[in-house]
C-alpha cells in the first residue's frame, strides 16, 4: 500500500496460502488490487500483479498464475458458498446525523459503539449479519435489530409492521422513533408505540 510506513513483500508461497485459506473459509473468488501498477501518481509503487517490468516471469505474477491454475482445477469441486444472512442490524446515516445533532443526549454517546454492542454478540456466536439502512427490504430476515433508531423515515414503520405481521422479529432500543425524516419531533403518539405495545411517559 502507499500509506503505510513499511511494506514488506509477502514471503514465497504466502500469497498462495492466504488465497487458498480464503477459499477454504467460504470465499468464491480471489481478487487483486491492483492488477497493473500505474506509471504515475500516488499509487505508482503500490503492489500489483503486473509490475513496471511488464513481465510474466517475476515471482508475484508466477504465484498468481499458480493460484489461477489450481482454482481452475478446483472450480468443479467447490460449491458456491454465498450465504444469506438471516439477521440484519439497521445502521442508517441520516439517523446518525440526526443523533449527532440532538442536544438532549450525553456527549459520551457513540452510535457506532451502540451498533457494535449488538454486532459483537452475533459475531462471537458465528451468526452472519447484514448491515442495512431503513430503506432496505426487511422480509428477507428472521431478525432485525434497530439500535437507537432515533429518526424514523415516513414509510419505515409501515414496513416494520408488515414485517412483524409476516412473522419477523423486530428488536429496537431506547431513544428510538423520536423524530421524523426532517428531524422534527413526533407530536402525540410515537410511530412504534402500537407495534411495541408501550408508550414513553417520561424521559430522565
What residue ranges belong to the model's regions?
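Carbohydrate-binding surfaces of carbohydrate-active enzymes
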Residues: 1-204
Amino acid at each position: 500500500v502507499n500509506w503505510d510506513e513499511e511494506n514488506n513483500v509477502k514471503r514465497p508461497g504466502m500469497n498462495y496460502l492466504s488465497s487458498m485459506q480464503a477459499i477454504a473459509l467460504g470465499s468464491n473468488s480471489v481478487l487483486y488490487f491492483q492488477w497493473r501498477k500505474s506509471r504515475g501518481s500516488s499509487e505508482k509503487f503500490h503492489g500489483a500483479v503486473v509490475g513496471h517490468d511488464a513481465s510474466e516471469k517475476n515471482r508475484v505474477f508466477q504465484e498468481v498464475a499458480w493460484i489461477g491454475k489450481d482454482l481452475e482445477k478446483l472450480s468443479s469441486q467447490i460449491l458456491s458458498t454465498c450465504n444469506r444472512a438471516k439477521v440484519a442490524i439497521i445502521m442508517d446515516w441520516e439517523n446518525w446525523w440526526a443523533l449527532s445533532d440532538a442536544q438532549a443526549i450525553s456527549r459520551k454517546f457513540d452510535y457506532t459503539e451502540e451498533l457494535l454492542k449488538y454486532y459483537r454478540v452475533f459475531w462471537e456466536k458465528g451468526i452472519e449479519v447484514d448491515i442495512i439502512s431503513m430503506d432496505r427490504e426487511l422480509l428477507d430476515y428472521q431478525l432485525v435489530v434497530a439500535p437507537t433508531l432515533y429518526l424514523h423515515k415516513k414509510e419505515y414503520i409501515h414496513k416494520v409492521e408488515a414485517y412483524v405481521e409476516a412473522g419477523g422479529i423486530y428488536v429496537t432500543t431506547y431513544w428510538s422513533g423520536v423524530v421524523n425524516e426532517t428531524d422534527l419531533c413526533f407530536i402525540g403518539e410515537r410511530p412504534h408505540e402500537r407495534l411495541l405495545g408501550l408508550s414513553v411517559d417520561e424521559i430522565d
